Amino acid sequence: MAAAGASASGLILSRPVTFVTGNAKKLEEVRYILGQSIPFNSLKLDLPELQGEPEDISKEKARLAAIQVNGPVLVEDTCLCFNALKGLPGPYIKWFLQKIGHEGLNNLLMAYEDKSAYALCAFSFALGPDAEPVTFLGKTPGKIVPPRGPNDFGWDPIFQPDGYEQTYAEMPKEEKNKISHRYKALALVKSHFAKAGYVFQTDSPI
């Protein structure tokens, strides 16, 4: 592990966590949700595009990132799962979105009455290159709708969470960040850090 040692109270000391992302919007949300609870830096890494279940993909990315960073890392994998399609596009939503766009994603469900879906977020944390990653899942149910709202963050315009009349894209940021799949997963991350008693050096985040 990349832990530097232990304090008198037995707390683990380490470098700040490196959150691996090249997505500015995602980074903005993570900073908003975590606040000052977990000091972290951000870094874009070229990690291989993996296939499999969301939790397995997230864990393997954390292992690979921890080796490159040689320290504690947090990685995220996000899915949009259509119930009528048995969970697809799932972890491949990024590529579906790039190829067919919001309209194409709606068209995938044209022949189905069931427009229900869920947003799934898998965060994996590895304390270092020799540590087994721990994974935290957040899930928000909703439905797929024709795109509404700003078109500047992935599939947000076509996902309307249950109990709301707005899509993710239409919601105020502070509202979305209280109910999103990302918020739910990060709440578990924060709880894990608090219970584990990690104490990290507080370098200024970048």
UniProtKB/Swiss-Prot annotation:
Positions that bind Mg(2+): 49
The residues that hold ITP are 21-26, 61, 77-78, 94, 153-156, 176, 181-182
InterPro entries noted in UniProt = ITPase, ITPase-like_fam, RdgB/HAM1
The domain of life for this entry's organism is: Eukaryota
Q: Which Gene3D superfamilies match?
A: 3.90.950.10
GO BP term, pick one = nucleoside triphosphate catabolic process
Its subcellular locations are: Cytoplasm
Q: Does the keyword Hydrolase apply?
A: yes
**Per the UniProt record, which EC number(s) apply here?**
3.6.1.66
Grouped into one coarse class, the protein's main location is cytoplasm
Q: Report the co-factor binding details.
A: Binds 1 divalent metal cation per subunit; can use either Mg(2+) or Mn(2+).
A GO cellular component annotated for this chain's UniProt record is: cytoplasm
Query: Which CDD domains does its entry note?
Result: HAM1
Reaction(s) catalysed by this chain, per the record, are: ITP + H2O = IMP + diphosphate + H(+); dITP + H2O = dIMP + diphosphate + H(+); XTP + H2O = XMP + diphosphate + H(+)
Keywords, A to Z?
Cytoplasm, Hydrolase, Magnesium, Manganese, Metal-binding, Nucleotide metabolism, Nucleotide-binding
Which is an annotated GO molecular function term of this record? metal ion binding
Q: What class of enzyme is it?
A: hydrolase
Which SUPFAM superfamilies does this chain map to? ITPase-like (SSF52972)
For activity, the cofactor(s) needed are: Mg(2+); Mn(2+)
The task this protein performs is described as:
Pyrophosphatase that hydrolyzes non-canonical purine nucleotides such as inosine triphosphate (ITP), deoxyinosine triphosphate (dITP) or xanthosine 5'-triphosphate (XTP) to their respective monophosphate derivatives. The enzyme does not distinguish between the deoxy- and ribose forms. Probably excludes non-canonical purines from RNA and DNA precursor pools, thus preventing their incorporation into RNA and DNA and avoiding chromosomal lesions.
* Subunit field text: Homodimer.
Q: Which family does it belong to?
A: Belongs to the HAM1 NTPase family.
What name does the UniProt record give this protein?
Inosine triphosphate pyrophosphatase
